[in-house]
Curated annotation (Swiss-Prot):
It comes from Xenopus laevis. The lineage of its organism: Eukaryota, Metazoa, Chordata, Craniata, Vertebrata. This is Dual specificity mitogen-activated protein kinase kinase 1. The modification Phosphoserine is found at S218, S222. InterPro entries: Kinase-like_dom_sf, MAP_kinase_kinase, Prot_kinase_dom, Protein_kinase_ATP_BS, Ser/Thr_kinase_AS. Residues 9-24 have a biased composition (Polar residues). Keywords: ATP-binding, Cytoplasm, Cytoskeleton, Kinase, Nucleotide-binding, Nucleus, Phosphoprotein, Serine/threonine-protein kinase, Transferase, Tyrosine-protein kinase. The keyword RNA-binding does not apply. One of its GO terms (biological process) is regulation of stress-activated MAPK cascade. One of its GO terms (cellular component) is centrosome.
Length: 395
């Protein structure tokens, strides 16, 4: 069915003319924003939601530490802690990420300045941004609160995420990455399940992408992790591009499909435990069993893997030097397997790009499928479903 021409987005200028986090809210700004939003080919529901978010945001004004009240902790990681907070002047619920950094004022100001680009990132596939400020040794990044949490939290509850649900996730991630690249010349740099957020309306959005080079540099030493979603070319320190984000998406999809970080790959015994039936190993991957490792390694995955876990340096060596992970045959559709294989090609020049992935048969099939993403998420996470969930035909 051809898309009908979207109605123009209606945004009311802020009546008091106050600045939103230091940005003037003149009519000219609103007209420019309206024009940008009209280029996005949104459906009616997406348009209304973006419009509602931006109208709410106009009421917020300048963000200050005193205006927030903590509701609960949402999670920690990526060098910071995220809280669910109430913005007292407007009663809006937000997610506030606090990043503690020992840095000079000039660097701090540069980070806040660079984060202002987030004000222009308005897409149904990108988490909404209210503003960023500095207070008491911490940078605060205030975002839209997504009540379903991140996909790593959903995965822990669900055990495994069904292929049809992952089809909707794939569409949203590709559209989010395409938006960042085409409209803002931004790479994400950190695609993984914990940076894909979902809500009870059935929306799927990317967060924590690399808009601030200075923030990335300032946090470079804060990586403490037992798993890596980085592409082989990035781990080797060679030039990397948005192709690196595609590897990370592919690895994340395999993890969510099998229920555990996929390196080293599960053996036949573990696959049987995961899927409750005998699973065919891909004939080509029969020799891919990881080299035996000494016991007592720090944990690097969860799931019923009886083998000793890998140390982080072994894991990184495995990503660079061993064949990429695959979805096991006989459990997943051929299109899904092929889609993941095209994301997980070690040579970035041979890896599928965003345009190719968007027209892949797995995506085309997923766009046509009626999937109640909101219903599945709400029953998995014990959430109350709102009255107007997103009808995720094409997300």
């Amino acid at each position: 069915m051809p898309k009908k021409k979207p109605t123009p987005i209606q945004l009311n200028p802020n009546p008091e003319g106050t600045a939103v986090n230091g940005t003037p809210t003149a009519e000219t700004n609103l007209e420019a924003l309206q024009k940008k939003l009209e280029e996005l080919e949104l459906d009616e529901q997406q348009r209304k939601r973006l419009e509602a978010f931006l109208t709410q945001k106009q009421k917020v004004g300048e963000l200050k530490d005193d205006d927030f009240e903590k509701v609960s902790e949402l999670g920690a990681g990526n060098g910071g802690v995220v809280f669910k907070v109430s913005h007292k002047p407007t009663s809006l619920i937000m997610a506030r990420k606090l990043i503690h950094l020992e840095i000079k004022p000039a660097i701090r100001n540069q980070i806040i300045r660079e984060l202002q680009v987030l004000h222009e990132c308005n897409s149904p596939y990108i988490v909404g941004f209210y503003g960023a400020f500095y207070s008491d040794g911490e940078i605060s990044i205030c975002m839209e609160h997504m009540d379903g949490g991140s996909l790593d939290q959903v995965l822990k509850k669900a055990g495994k995420i069904p292929e049809k649900i992952l089809g909707k996730v794939s569409i949203a991630v590709i559209k989010g990455l395409t938006y960042l690249r085409e409209k803002h010349k931004i790479m994400h740099r950190d695609v993984k399940p914990s940076n894909i957020l979902v809500n009870s309306r059935g929306e799927i959005k990317l967060c924590d992408f690399g808009v601030s080079g200075q923030l990335i540099d300032s946090m470079a030493n804060s990586f403490v992790g037992t798993r890596s979603y980085m592409s082989p070319e990035r781990l080797q320190g060679t030039h990397y591009s948005v192709q690196s984000d595609i590897w990370s998406m592919g690895l994340s999809l395999v993890e969510m499909a099998i229920g555990r970080y996929p390196i080293p790959p599960p053996d036949a015994k573990e696959l049987e435990l995961i899927f409750g039936c005998s699973v065919e190993r891909d004939p080509a991957s029969s020799e891919l069993a990881p080299r035996p490792r000494p016991p007592g390694r720090p944990i690097s995955s969860y799931g019923p893997d009886s083998r000793p876990p890998m140390a982080i340096f072994e894991l990184l060596d495995y990503i660079v030097n061993e064949p990429p992970p695959k979805l096991p045959s006989g459990v997943f559709g051929a299109e899904f397997q092929d889609f993941v294989n095209k994301c997980l090609v070690k040579n970035p020049a041979e890896r599928a790009d965003l345009k190719q992935l968007m027209v892949h048969s797995f995506i085309k099939q997923s766009e046509l499928e009626e999937v109640d993403f909101a219903g599945w998420l709400c029953s998995t996470m014990g959430l109350k479903q709102p009255s107007t969930p997103t009808h995720a035909a094409g997300v």
